[in-house]
């Protein structure tokens, strides 16, 4: 089976799909990722073959808020518009790739629409692959409406519904939305990186907390440092061993670090099993990785799906949330003390990890896709 993976050129969009790509390859299937030239090394660094056929697009721009005055669309609907427009721009190159490569199946993350549109118009079934919580209905419906209107102008068929939707979110974390899905275990992948000796040296002497701003937030907002510095100082004051997972290029944002605080590019999949808590921005990669390891989460959401992730973690009791513009030291201190303590959020976080571990592995899902591919038809 020839499988084409399509994703926006963003780590948070592609990396959750990588384990399924590996599983398909290991089962003997041919996997190709469609991307742009700048993102090509990221894909190939994950051990997947890729072709640079797309024009560059910055996923951060798709989620950038607009001034509310005069804009009748909600943030989710506005993002849906932008995703559809990006899909239309990428469609000619994606159709050309599908025509020459002849995939048997296209697998796309929710924000990438050129792959599904090209698959639809080539009579190829496509599958949606979530990267966390499934995006809100208004986002997906507006994206489909805008895309279908553009496809009609081009004389092309409207977007077919996905033949399957692969869901990597634990059931109790995901809101009830009635969407039928194929459950799959979330397997954290954070890119190639060396593991430092100190991380392999056994349990830490003090409780260890991971602090991370993710990959997109420092690029989008270089002025995030003050609140994160307050969080860092409070965690240190509580006697925690703080490890900051951050790209080296963003390291200067944090200024001089207190003694004993480490900051480096460390994969969360290696760091989190040693941690008692994580403080992060609410991105799906950090949220899902922490959930998969049963680590309580303190979330400071800034944009896009950060808010939804924070709301769901708070609702199920697996985490806490702070507004990104707070400077209330008492509130910050209380949140840090709670998330590093032994409250009920610790048992609930462990339950999320247990739920994730019971889900079918990517290898099992890959086997199912191969068995069912011939019966999938674009709807």
From Swiss-Prot:
Family the entry assigns: Belongs to the glycosyltransferase 28 family.
The protein's name in its UniProt record: L-demethylnoviosyl transferase
Provenance organism: Streptomyces niveus
Pathway it works in: Antibiotic biosynthesis; novobiocin biosynthesis
Pfam families registered for this protein in UniProt: EryCIII-like_C, EryCIII-like_N
Any one Gene Ontology BP term: novobiocin biosynthetic process
Annotated catalysed reactions: dTDP-4-O-demethyl-beta-L-noviose + novobiocic acid = desmethyldescarbamoylnovobiocin + dTDP + H(+)
EC number: 2.4.1.302
InterPro entries tied to this protein: EryCIII-like_C, EryCIII-like_N, Glycosyltransferase_28, UDP_glucos_trans
Regulation: Inhibited by TDP-L-rhamnose, the sugar donor that most closely structurally resembles the natural substrate dTDP-beta-L-noviose.
Top-level EC class: transferase
Gene3D superfamilies: Glycogen Phosphorylase B
UniProt function note: Catalyzes the transfer of L-noviose from dTDP-4-O-demethyl-beta-L-noviose to the phenolic oxygen of novobiocic acid, creating the full ABC ring system in the novobiocin biosynthesis pathway. Novobiocin is an aminocoumarin family antibiotic that targets bacterial DNA gyrases. Also shows activity with variant coumarin aglycones, suggesting it may be a promiscuous catalyst for noviosylation of a range of planar scaffolds. Does not show activity with TDP-L-rhamnose.
Molecular functions (GO terms): hexosyltransferase activity; UDP-glycosyltransferase activity
